Amino acid sequence: MKKILILIPALNPPRQLIDYVKSLLDNGLKDILLVDDGSKEEFREIFDTVEKIPNGNIKVFRHAKNLGKGRALKNAFNYFLTLPNLAEYSGVVTADSDGQHRVEDVIKLAKEVEENPNKLILGCRNFDLEQVPPKSRFGNKITNGAFKLFYGKNISDTQTGLRGFPTAIIKDFLDIAGERFEYETKMLIYCFQKEIGIKEVVIETIYFNDNSETHFNPIVDSIKIYRVTLSPFLKYIASATSSFILDILSFKWILAILIAFGNIEGATVITISTIIARIISSSFNFYLNKKFVFKYEQNTKKSLLKYYSLCIVQMLLSAVLVSIVWKYTKYTETGIKIVVDSALFLLSYFVQQRWVFKRK
């Protein structure tokens, strides 16, 4: 079995970090890298003590100021990839500094990294257990639900700090933006987009002192994480809005040109202008959705055919539903169309995600 580097980012860690590192060493995990992410001066003694523990290859990488967990991980990944004996390692396992990840579970992930050289390994907790703090249970349930809704992926523990990174995929994660806790969320999204496999491994769920040692800011970091999670849908809205504006402008310009230079009148010129404008705006919308919203890099012809099939079905559904609702209610056609098309707009997002731009 190859070596594994245990990476522990730490900010003002508890003293039990010393015993935790000793336990890792006692269980054969000899290569350990700690990142002191700008801890206060009174915590320096803890890092110095850990660095002097015998019978291991322990290094402490220090930040002059707190740069965030995302930056700590990226700097450590970069250090790992520059090791002269990199070929001796199967990869990296990250663990939290508060000791909430059992040594047995760290070993479990190390083995999974060895056996799955092209997958991200997640050590996943059970949030239905009684010992889980309510705020942690609620936060993870919401985040996991958002991933299922907006990405069509079921990740049971999106915020786990116990992760395994095979050497072959680590370089990819250096390009991901994010300096704090949102970086770990972006990792998962990146894996979805680049079709990097994710394997979940069940680990023991441990919380000390109601998770009071965490440096996770429930307001600031939650906002960043949810902003990242909702990013594709927000881009989808922006794509649709810009395409709508282009459709109106194209219709106006084409209509003016046909009236000025063509011998066409009445409904015919409106129909032709509408068709040409819709071809322009829908092509633009397809490009934006493929390139920026869903970041789909596979068969363009196949996805284009699916996209226009969806457009036709969506148009027919709109006409049928508006007609039916109008027939049996007293509401105006325009008001009904706004409601119906808004619902179809939301439905279209999920159809595009799960069918038009579905990854293998």
Model-derived regions: residue spans:
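Acceptor/aglycone-binding surface of glycosyltransferases and processive sugar-polymer synthases
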Residues: 65, 71-80, 89, 103-181, ...
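Active-site donor/metal-binding and catalytic loop motifs
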Residues: 199-217, 295
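Short, well-formed alpha-helical segments that are part of the catalytic scaffolds
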Residues: 12-26
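Cell-envelope/extracellular polymer assembly enzymes that use nucleotide-activated donors
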Residues: 3-5, 31, 186
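Catalytic donor-sugar/metal-binding loop of nucleotide-sugar-dependent glycosyltransferases
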Residues: 154, 176-179, 188-206
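A conserved acidic beta->alpha catalytic loop
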Residues: 36-47, 65, 99
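Conserved donor nucleotide-binding strand/loop of the catalytic core
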Residues: 47-87, 91
